[in-house]
């Protein structure tokens, strides 16, 4: 503060002159890297659940889904060695098994990472797995009905009729022999065994498809329940934080009393 001396009626009076106040304003600009890192942190926080833990039940269902998909693909290879049916022509054993493997991998990745985006993708894959498994089940049931029909049995058994010699040859007559009958019966016996084997493959494939539907629905139910529980927990945390912030509001400033100045 600057001082000045003034003489009033022979008396020196010292007065002070107020100096001008200087206000220094410093504006800090964040760099582009800091802004990018902050945006990535906000995105990661938005796409992830807070304090998420691994559900081992869901993880085991994902591993089971992968195994069922692998078994489905192996059965698809085995079915191609049998008679040509609609089940083989459609290739449903391969595409339904591939979708099941992808759904299982999606479940495992989601449980290990606990992200919102991975959760949505895994649920979409589970829906696709259920749809493809249902379509494969319908084809498997149709193939079972056809393989157990009488027309299919006669069609397969007719391939052994070529082993029987003709009744009249061009130059001489040929009679049936016990050897030709034995070969025909042996051929039909082998064909019957092969028919039963591929029928067992078809039954096993249909059961695998039904299990894929059950596992997919169970995984989808657990995923939806976990998502609803996490969302409700986030809402409760936000409400608690709002209550705490509302309770910590600053108290009202006290009223200033006017002090009378005596002359």
Swiss-Prot record:
GO cellular component: nuclear membrane
Induction: Up-regulated in tolerated allografts. Down-regulated in activated macrophages.
Sorted UniProt keywords: Differentiation, Membrane, Nucleus, Phosphoprotein, Transmembrane, Transmembrane helix
Pfam family, one: CD20
Keyword Nucleus set for record: yes
Segments for region (Disordered): 242-263
Signal peptide: none
Domain of life of the organism encoding this protein: Eukaryota
Tissue and organ expression note: Expressed in spleen by a variety of myeloid cells including macrophages and dendritic cells (at protein level). Ubiquitously expressed with higher expression in lymphoid tissues.
Modification Phosphoserine occurs at: 249, 253
GO biological process, one term: negative regulation of dendritic cell differentiation
Transmembrane stretches, start-end: 61-81, 89-109, 125-145, 197-217
Additional note from the record: Overexpression of Tmem176b alters maturation of bone marrow-derived dendritic cells.
Protein family (similarity comment): Belongs to the TMEM176 family.
Name of the molecule in the record: Transmembrane protein 176B
